[in-house]
Amino acid sequence: MPVPSVTVTTDNEYEDISSFSSIDSYKPEPFTGFKDSEAPEQPLLKNDTIVGKGQLEDDSNVDDQHRHSDVHSHHSSSTLKRPTSNSIEKMVTHNALEGNSETVDSLKEDGLNLNKKALPDITAPVTNSAHDAAFPEEYRLETETGLVKLKTLESLKREDSRVSSTKKEHINDHTDMHSTRSKVTTNSQGSSLEPNKLNMAVEKNKKRIEKYQKHKSEKGIKGFFHRIFD
């Protein structure tokens, strides 16, 4: 009976898989963005629905008014997706090459006077100095709000800018009060300077001084009671 032959295979006959390491085959390259032909075909999202190519062709007339005419891109301003940095760079570069960007020369060509002062601010009558009045609304603001410039107050020699009936009433009340106080003060001063009352006050003070001089040298309980009750 013949003996069947047995073929023995060793590990040396197989290729070493360690030579297929991904580290040896990897070559890093900078990402420069997709080209128009290589860009992945992704459906555009619009109004929470997926829009296919067929529907996009039907709605091309509507979408054309929203698309950027100067950018060859599949992005639309009506989509919910944000434009990538690559598309933005292409847009800026395209506009710069086509001369669609604003420069000093282009503004001059459009008729813009770069030396002309801009329109004054609405708060200019209140915040600027007195000689910078640019429009007559300043005087209306002064009349209605009382926000008068310091220069105007100095020229009027006034401390308050508000002029109204309530202000006049307040001035009258203040004048009446001042006159009343003046009368009271005058009456009190006149009554205190009468000769009889003045002599009585002098005599009273003289007696108090004499008692003080009499008892100031006394000591003990007697002197204490004299100084208090005398």
UniProtKB/Swiss-Prot annotation:
This is Uncharacterized protein YGR126W. Residues 63-73, 156-179 have a biased composition (Basic and acidic residues). Keywords: Phosphoprotein. GO terms for cellular component: cytoplasm; nucleus. Residues 1-88, 156-203 are annotated as: Disordered. The lineage of its organism: Eukaryota, Fungi, Dikarya, Ascomycota, Saccharomycotina. The modification Phosphoserine is found at residue 106. Residues 1-11, 79-88, 182-194 have a biased composition (Polar residues). It comes from Saccharomyces cerevisiae (strain ATCC 204508 / S288c) (Baker's yeast).
